[in-house]
Amino acid sequence: MIKRHENMTETVKVNMRGGDGQAVVTDILNKGEYKGHARLLGTILLEPGCSIGAHVHENEEEVFYVIEGTATYNDNGKTEILHKGDSCICLGGETHSIANRTENENLTVFAVFLTF
């Protein structure tokens, strides 16, 4: 199966999970287009000053891979800086958040929500 960018679903989420600004979520594949146990296979774009607020994942795990930009990542209360090529995982029952605290560069992450 091939899916062209123009056929992907893009959603703008304002104050996602209590964060600042907006997150642009692009579903690379939608449910029904794959057989695995996932809730999201896509990218998330955060412009400078935007973030996804702290939240807990229950019955799922979330993986981020930084495609471009610099992320300020809260991993269970510990803040880390992630750069292009870095990845992180939030396991079930854990808390995380992600922010673009830069002044002039976008942050784009590949995101996978694995359900169980």
Predicted stretch roles:
Residues 1-38:
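A short, N-terminal "cap"/entry segment at the start of jelly-roll beta-barrel domains
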Residues 59-61, 65-71:
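Glycine- and acidic-residue-biased ligand/ion/polar-headgroup-sensing regions
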Residues 77-92:
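Short acidic-glycine-tyrosine-enriched beta hairpin
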Residues 89, 104-116:
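A short hydrophobic beta-strand segment most commonly corresponding to one strand
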Residues 43, 63, 77-81:
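Short, surface-exposed secondary-structure edge patches
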Residues 48, 59-60, 78, 94-95, ...:
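A generic "binding-loop/recognition-motif" signal
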Residues 27-31, 42-57:
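Conserved short histidine dyad/triad with adjacent acidic residue
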Residues 54, 73-74, 90, 96-103:
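Short beta-strand His + acidic residue motifs that chelate non-heme Fe in jelly-roll/DSBH
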